[in-house]
Amino acid sequence: FDQFKKSKGIVIEIMKVAIPSTAEQLIMSGLTMAINAMLVIVSTTTAVAVYTASMRIVSMAMIPLMGIATALLTVAGAAYGARNYEKLKTSFTYSIKFGLVISLILGALTFIFAPQIALMFSYSAATAYLTPQIAFALRIFCFFLIFVPFGIAGSFVFQGVGKGTSSLLITIIRSLFAEVVLAYLFGIVLGYGEMGIFAGVIIGSFIGSMFGYSWARLFI
């Protein structure tokens, strides 16, 4: 470390990605709280438990997709730094295709084995009544996985090239303007209740993910 010299420019470049990335995590937490609040309004705390358990399982299924996105971030950064835009485009396309295949497989497995998976999260006598509800929710949210590769690739490619603000904007549009607004519209305004909120989350995810994908394609 005796050769280390501080560089204000490098610190600024790091913070351009680090701060928006941190804000994205806060937004995702805010999304969860907003959905939970709406579920309490239209239903009961049981609906919150079902949603929480279902999304926890979906989050586990997203781990491979996050791994692919992290790899994309690294490759995209190297390609952008080397001015190799063709490699940037290729890595972006391949990550989406690979992620889509994985999400389709995981989504199908989740749909087929939803009752068995739900049982793992409601095995006690006190929570046994939640099993069919969690299984039903899983069969709805498995469609959520299909759109994840598009949105996550768009966000991570922007992070890879140092444009953290663009990645943050994608998250804001997807989580706040699409998922929360549509969940509120379908669940509360139109009166579809719990199912309306679930549908709003999925449709909002689709809209937000396609926006992120399209913006990243235009940028590349």
Question: Where are the predicted features?
Answer:
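Helix-terminus/linker motif at the lipid-water interface of multi-pass membrane proteins
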Residues: 29-54, 60, 78-79, 118-125, ...
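Short runs within selected transmembrane alpha-helices of multi-pass transporters and secretion channels
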Residues: 66-69, 141-160, 166-175, 182, ...
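Short alpha-helical transmembrane segments in multi-pass integral membrane proteins
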Residues: 1-18, 76-144, 187-220
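Hydrophobic faces of transmembrane alpha-helices in multi-pass small-molecule transporters and flippases
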Residues: 3-34, 39, 60, 64, ...
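Membrane-helix interface segments
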Residues: 46-47, 164-166, 193-194
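Alpha-helical transmembrane segments of multipass membrane proteins
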Residues: 24, 28, 32, 58, ...
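Small-residue-rich hydrophobic transmembrane alpha-helices
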Residues: 50-114, 148-170
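Transmembrane alpha-helix boundary and packing residues in multipass membrane permease domains
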Residues: 21, 25, 33, 37, ...
